[in-house]
A protein has these predicted regions:
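Amphipathic alpha-helical interface segments
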Residues: 81, 85-154, 158, 170
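Amphipathic alpha-helical coiled-coil segments
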Residues: 67-74, 120, 127, 187-190, ...
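Preference for long, well-ordered alpha-helical segments
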Residues: 130-133, 145-205
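Accessory "access/gating" subregions that flank catalytic or transport cores
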Residues: 2-7, 198-210
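Transmembrane signal-anchor/signal-peptide helices with a preference for the extracytoplasmic
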Residues: 42-54
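A structural-propensity feature for long, helix-poor, extended segments
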Residues: 51-90, 197
C-alpha cells in the first residue's frame, strides 16, 4: 500500500471515508496541518522575488524554509498516526491465557497507548509551529494574500485542536500518571498560546480588510 502522505487528495479522502479506522482523526489533523503549512509557503512564495518586498525577503525566505519543513513533517505524521493506531489495536489480539501472557499483553497495550498519544502530540506541536509562521506572514508577507495567511493560521489551530483530542483519548490507557501529566501540561500551554496567536493574526487581517 502506498504511503498515505503520497496519495492524491481524492485517494486520501476515500481512505479517510472508508470503514477502516485508520486514517482517522489524527491523520486528518496532520493533513490539515500540512495544508496550513502549504498555504504559509504560498504566501511566502508570493512575497519572495518582488522588489517592493525586498526589505523583508531574507525573513520571508526563512519562513518559507520552516513552512516546507513542517509540511514534510506533518505528511510523515499522517502515516505515523495510522501506524501507531494499527500497532495499538494489534496488542488486543495478543494471547491472554496465562498470567504471564496477560501481563505481557497489558504492558504492550500501555506502551502502544503512549505511542498513540505521542504522535498526535507531535502533530499538535508541528501545527502550532505552522500557526506561528502564519502569525508572522500576515505581517511580513504580501498583503495581497493576507487572507491566505489567515486561512493558514485557522487551519493550523484547527489541526492542533483535533490533535489534542487524539492525545487525550489515549492518555487514560497509558497508566503512566507522570507522563500523562506532562503531556496534558504541554497541551494546555500549546492551546493557550495558539488562542493568543490566532486572535492576533485575525486582528491584523481584519484591520487590513477595513
Amino acid at each position: 500500500m502506498n504511503k498515505l502522505g503520497d496519495l492524491s487528495c481524492k485517494e486520501f479522502l476515500t481512505e479517510l471515508a472508508s470503514a477502516a479506522p485508520a486514517p482517522g482523526g489524527g491523520g486528518g489533523a496532520a493533513m490539515a496541518g500540512a495544508l496550513a503549512a502549504a498555504l504559509a509557503s504560498m504566501v511566502a512564495n508570493l512575497t519572495i522575488g518582488k522588489e517592493k518586498f525586498a526589505d523583508r525577503e531574507s525573513e520571508v525566505k526563512e519562513l518559507l524554509e520552516q513552512a516546507e519543513a513542517e509540511r514534510v513533517r506533518l505528511l510523515t505524521l499522517v502515516d505515523e498516526d495510522a501506524a501507531v493506531f494499527n500497532s495499538f489495536m494489534s496488542c488486543y489480539k495478543l494471547p491472554k491465557t496465562t498470567d504471564e501472557e496477560k501481563a505481557a499483553r497489558t504492558a504492550a497495550i500501555r506502551a502502544a497507548a503512549k505511542q498513540a498519544a505521542t504522535v498526535p502530540l507531535n502533530i499538535a506541536r508541528s501545527s502550532f509551529a505552522v500557526l506561528k509562521l502564519a502569525d508572522r506572514l500576515v505581517v511580513s508577507g504580501n498583503p495581497g494574500v493576507i487572507t491566505d495567511g489567515a486561512c493558514s493560521g485557522l487551519l493550523a489551530r484547527a489541526a492542533l485542536r483535533c490533535a489534542e483530542y487524539n492525545v487525550r483519548i489515549n492518555l487514560g490507557l497509558t497508566k503512566d500518571e507522570a507522563w500523562n501529566a506532562q503531556a496534558a501540561a504541554d497541551l494546555k500551554q500549546l492551546l493557550a498560546d495558539a488562542e493568543a496567536l490566532e486572535t492576533r493574526l485575525l486582528a491584523v487581517t481584519d484591520k487590513a480588510l477595513q
